[in-house]
Swiss-Prot record:
It is a multi-pass membrane protein. It is an enzyme of class 3 (hydrolase). One of its GO terms (biological process) is signal peptide processing. It holds the Pfam family Peptidase_S26. It catalyses: Cleavage of hydrophobic, N-terminal signal or leader sequences from secreted and periplasmic proteins. This is Signal peptidase I. Belongs to the peptidase S26 family. PROSITE patterns: SPASE_I_1, SPASE_I_2, SPASE_I_3.
Amino acid sequence: MSNYLSSFLLASSLITGTLWIINKILSHNLLDSKIPFNIKKSKIYYKSKQVVQTFASFFPILIIVFIIRTFICEPFQIPSESMMPTLLPGDFILVKKFSYGIKNPFSNNVIVFINTPKRGDIVVFKHPNNNAINYVKRIVGLPGDKINYNILTKRLTITPNNINEQHTKNISINYKYIKPNDFTKHFKLNNIILNNVHSLESSNNNLLQLEMYQEKIEKIAYNIFFKKKLIDQKDLYFKQFSQKQGTWIVPKHKYFVLGDNRDNSLDSRYWGFVPEKNLIGKVVFIWMHLIKKEGQWPTGIQFDRIGNIY
């Protein structure tokens, strides 16, 4: 949807821009004086000029919107639960497009470099296997990092600078259990199994309460969801050549991303790394949250969801 809108804005800007130039030329006194009086008074000329002026008037607005969406910021809506508890379905987010650089809107190549992505950044990006689909996840692995994800404890181990097989110390990662509250969500186990992403050790009932933890990678802390009884189907993991399943070394100019809702997220564990070229921008702000139930119209706006994302 976002790609179609960008194409529409570009096409509309080009068309209205052309009409804007034509209107300026036709309105020039020197050219206007050379047009015969009988032509200027004809209905066809009058209506044609009106049409040109009307469409040309949209050009300044369209070009401003196009520039803002392409180079400055762009709104997105969160459709799924993969980034809970940080981002919820119904959140409308603002993405800073120039966080890492100003890009060519056609080739997506960086024109002006600004900064490199940081560990912990929440980013919107084009899916590595389908550029028509936009995803939102959190960067946990930088180029050169060796990532290990334990399917039993749901904990990360990150060792930096592994591209040249250098031996370095693991990055400090700490986990702190957060007491359950009304925000913690229940999921139907049957639905999770049908997604072919998870299997269960055992279950005595139909509902499983996810647990909230604080994950702190060095100085960056955020909350995540997972349940130890829910075991990932490791055979579905992306298998990197020469690495054990569940272990990856992030190549140059690529990133390893995870959803904060670890048991309900298709991310780099399943389809691999995100090329730097695919990054659209960094999520910086929630500007609206609609209150709605699945299959129903929104019933209101939740104002306490509005604000910066850290």
